[in-house]
Amino acid sequence: MDFAMSAKAIDYRTRLSDFMTEHVFGAEADYDDYRRAAGPADHTAPPIIEELKTKAKDRGLWNLFLSAESGLTNLEYAPLAEMTGWSMEIAPEALNCAAPDTGNMEILHMFGTEQQRAQWLRPLLDGKIRSAFSMTEPAVASSDARNIETTISRDGADYVINGRKWWTSGAADPRCKILIVMGRTNPDAAAHQQQSMVLVPIDTPGVTIVRSTPVFGWQDRHGHCEIDYHNVRVPATNLLGEEGSGFAIAQARLGPGRIHHCMRALGAAERALALMVNRVRNRVAFGRPLAEQGVVQQAIAQSRNEIDQARLLCEKAAWTIDQHGNKEARHLVAMIKAVAPRVACDVIDRAIQVHGAAGVSDDTPLARLYGWHRAMRIFDGPDEVHLRSIARAELSREKSTFAAAVT
């Protein structure tokens, strides 16, 4: 098991580092000014985003997440995803590596027909449109996908969709043109073969965006939408994959995507730690620099330990997917999804505490980062679901020779 960076990954890291320091960090003030002036109800992209996308393309820093485009493995891409986490609202989109588009592009690449790829994947890869993934429902516990109630009924040459979704991330962005909707097509089939996915253009009659739901009172720019689907009719050719394959497609989508999310979370944690260290070097309390206070040193050391431990676990998951596939890595992916967001929350929380009142204000990115990563402990499966999966795997594991000898 070797996590050393390849020459290709090192080259990308160098170029991405230069891009971040020369263009991305300096663009954050422009981005924030635009958002502040536009107001929370406005979901348009600040012009600086398109400028950065052009620069990223020119530098070959585009679609790095998709191996078919970049040639990078999951392990090679992981540290690059972490780097983008230092500027979570700008860097991933500037590189066309932002969720939910990344997962949607992956499943279109894996399961889409030639026509579907030409119509939707190509514009997404070119950064001309955006997309959303519509799976979670307000009326049921959607952490168990078998509960999904939205129906996708065959009617001649069409499918008709009825149901209500929420937390459909990305649907409020005016550039969002396509929704990937998961619903029940085969109610009499086995539990994990009842669901399917269909491609729904966002302007299809019957699609109504009810609202964009705030996260801890903050409206994300791309929105997290509650959507009503009422007799939404799309051609049967809009089926993604096969009928009954929705659950399998969702699992294929979430494997690498969770690694991307978790590595970005560690990038955000690194930024919080950097802010913490800078703060304690420059503040004095009770006649001594904060950096000399034992409790502060403990917070810094604990944060470094946790970030590095979580990173190694993420790298192991990425390596396992590369070597053995998503199925073999599923428990490792569950582990990182339970670990990385909590680590990020804990590190950011310590940084907030060190900053005092400034930490909960908009003068630093810490409050925003905390809100996002606390939400991350719920989306893509709550902690409890992943911990349940890990525990069940451990309980079903055959005893090792040593375990058998001592138990």
UniProtKB/Swiss-Prot annotation:
| Recorded catalytic activity of this chain's protein | a 2,3-saturated acyl-CoA + A = a 2,3-dehydroacyl-CoA + AH2
Instruction: Give the EC class as a word.
Output: oxidoreductase
Question: Which Gene Ontology cellular-component terms appear in the entry?
Answer: cytoplasm; plasma membrane
Q: Which cofactor does it need?
A: FAD
EC annotation? 1.3.99.-
Per the record, the GO terms for biological process are: fatty acid beta-oxidation using acyl-CoA dehydrogenase
Keyword terms: FAD, Flavoprotein, Oxidoreductase
Q: Which domain of life is it from?
A: Bacteria
Q: Which GO terms describe its molecular function?
A: acyl-CoA dehydrogenase activity; flavin adenine dinucleotide binding
A Pfam match: Acyl-CoA_dh_M
Q: Which family does it belong to?
A: Belongs to the acyl-CoA dehydrogenase family.
Question: What is this protein's record name?
Answer: Probable acyl-CoA dehydrogenase FadE2
In which organism is this protein found?
Mycobacterium tuberculosis (strain ATCC 25618 / H37Rv)
